[in-house]
Amino acid sequence: MTGRTGFTLVEVMIVLAIVILLAALAWPSYAAYVVRSKRVEAVSALMETMQQQERLYSRRNRYLAFSRDDNPERLRWHSAADPRRSSHEISARPCGEQSLAACVELVAVPGSAAVDSAFRDPVCGTLTLNSQGVRSPEHAACWQ
């Protein structure tokens, strides 16, 4: 036998198969982690925006409805620091039939056209939080 060094094709294929198997096992956990982290980011943005709404209420005795296109107070309408990296678009509206003097509801919509449109949250979907403390969905994992 001569002094050849290197790997045979069979050895390379075995290593490649092992790497693919490990990646296939790790990918679902990684994807679930990304969704959870984006959800936490959205919840944090909702809480921060609600605090801004409460400050506005203390000055004006009413809350402010806003959206990405209509935002006179420049409240945060996206979940991350940069809209292009955000997973949720945030807006505010009156709660049901109540006026803005009584209640405001913040809505975080995942994967809209103004933010990362590829993002989906199959467990929680759209998150809502109102000034009376009611939030939906009520699933505990959505608010952790």
What are these regions (language model features)?
Residues 35-62:
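Membrane-proximal N-terminal amphipathic helix
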Residues 4, 33-40, 44, 99, ...:
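Residues at secondary-structure transition points
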Residues 7, 30-33, 57, 63, ...:
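Aromatic side chains
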Residues 59-144:
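Periplasmic/extracellular, small/polar-rich flexible segments of pilin-like filament-forming proteins
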Residues 1-33:
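N-terminal single-pass transmembrane signal-anchor helix
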